[in-house]
């Protein structure tokens, strides 16, 4: 744990521009590596192989997560890989873990038992399990997760609330998660679902790294969404135009007939206007998407991309108009994208007529709470039975985020 902690400290120093702290952390980390090896040798010598394996497994998870956040050209990566403990111990353990618990390719079947294990237990048992696995990471690694929860309070207002909400979701909705597992349309999606749920309960980061999408941009999987013509898109949570530019990069500016972009934050909306100004047929709306017409209070998040709307108005909160897409867009839609910080369910209800009548392609963020992952597919299934569901993962290793549900309309006979 000291070994991994020193490297974590080094990379934190690097991010903050502390060059001296970066170098010192690397040096201390490498000095700790032989001590780690000596401890393992001692345990093996005393026939405590299970204990040695457990210690190594926890350490390996931490180091793999650290490496996943670094550039392959980072000198710290080269220094780490030159260390004796990395060269002699980690490769064998990596190989063992891959063969034991990780599918080798996206086509390899993932056992439903892995999902069932993460869903097993009462709410109290699951909560106790979550606290236990969080503590195994050590104080600093656990603190980094808690800090993330508190910075982005999407899953709860405190660490206790997050764990309680997670335990309730897994214990009360196991059948819904299993339904989704069976309804997903490819093996990669089932691997993503399993990795996410196990990441929630057991804080496993290696499976998340194994399913991270590296070929395609978020929302635009070219295997599932090949280039279309005369597309009419609604981008809910358009931010500064990053999704629009990604769409143009992947499909070209001649592929869309109209692009509707909705954004609630003034600063982001201004940048969105600048981003899209050179392009024709882009319609901007500084409105929130919801179930129906109304107004809501804008609340600032940790960054401009995480601002949210709520009904509880305050004197300092800006008021934003909300609309239903069914009312706000009068022409047929072929593609709807949503990344609106937990308001996806309301927005989906607000575009139900578009979905029923036109059966557009859907790209929906499903990581802003513990419910959307199964709830949004259930809602779509109720509107139009037979939609094909896929999950893609663009997030990090330490906590599951950037999970996208891609939904294709039912195949026509």
Predicted features by range, described:
Residues 9, 16-413:
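Phosphate/nucleotide-binding beta-alpha loop and adjacent structural elements of enzyme active sites
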């Amino acid at each position: 744990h000291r070994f991994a902690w020193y490297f974590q400290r080094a990379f934190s120093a690097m991010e903050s521009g502390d060059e001296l702290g970066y170098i010192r952390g690397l040096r201390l980390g490498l000095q700790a590596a032989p001590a780690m090896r000596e401890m393992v040798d001692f345990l093996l010598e005393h026939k405590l192989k299970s204990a040695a394996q457990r210690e190594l497994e926890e350490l390996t998870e931490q180091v793999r997560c650290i490496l996943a956040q670094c550039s392959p050209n980072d000198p710290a990566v080269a220094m780490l890989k030159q260390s004796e403990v990395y060269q002699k111990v980690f490769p064998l353990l990596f190989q063992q873990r891959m063969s034991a618990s990780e599918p080798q390719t996206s086509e390899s079947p993932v056992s439903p038992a892995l999902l069932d294990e993460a869903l097993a237990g009462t709410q109290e048992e699951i909560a106790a399990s979550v606290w236990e696995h969080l503590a195994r990471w050590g104080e600093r690694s656990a603190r980094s997760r808690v800090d993330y929860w508190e910075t982005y309070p999407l899953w709860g207002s405190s660490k206790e609330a997050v764990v309680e909400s997670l335990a309730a979701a897994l214990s009360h909705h196991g059948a819904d998660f299993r339904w989704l597992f069976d309804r997903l349309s490819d093996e990669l999606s089932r691997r993503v679902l399993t990795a996410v749920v196990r990441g929630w309960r057991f804080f496993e980061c290696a499976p998340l790294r194994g399913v991270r999408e590296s070929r395609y941009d978020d929302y635009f999987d070219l295997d599932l969404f090949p280039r279309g013509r005369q597309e009419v898109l609604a981008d809910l949570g358009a931010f500064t135009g990053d999704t629009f530019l990604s769409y143009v990069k992947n499909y070209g500016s001649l592929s869309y007939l109209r692009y509707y972009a909705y954004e609630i934050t003034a600063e982001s909306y201004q940048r969105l206007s600048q981003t899209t100004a050179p392009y024709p047929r882009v319609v901007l709306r500084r409105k929130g998407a919801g179930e129906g017409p109304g107004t809501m209070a804008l609340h600032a998040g940790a960054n401009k991309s995480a601002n949210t709307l709520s009904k509880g108005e305050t004197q300092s909160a800006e008021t934003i108009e909300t609309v239903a897409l069914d009312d706000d867009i009068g022409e047929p839609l072929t593609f709807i994208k949503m990344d609106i910080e937990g308001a996806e369910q309301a927005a989906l209800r607000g575009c139900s007529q578009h979905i029923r009548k036109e059966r557009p392609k859907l790209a929906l963020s499903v990581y802003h709470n513990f419910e959307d992952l199964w709830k949004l597919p259930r809602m779509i299934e109720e509107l139009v039975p037979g939609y094909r569901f896929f999950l893609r993962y663009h997030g990090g290793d330490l906590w599951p985020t950037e999970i996208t549900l891609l939904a294709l309309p039912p195949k026509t006979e």
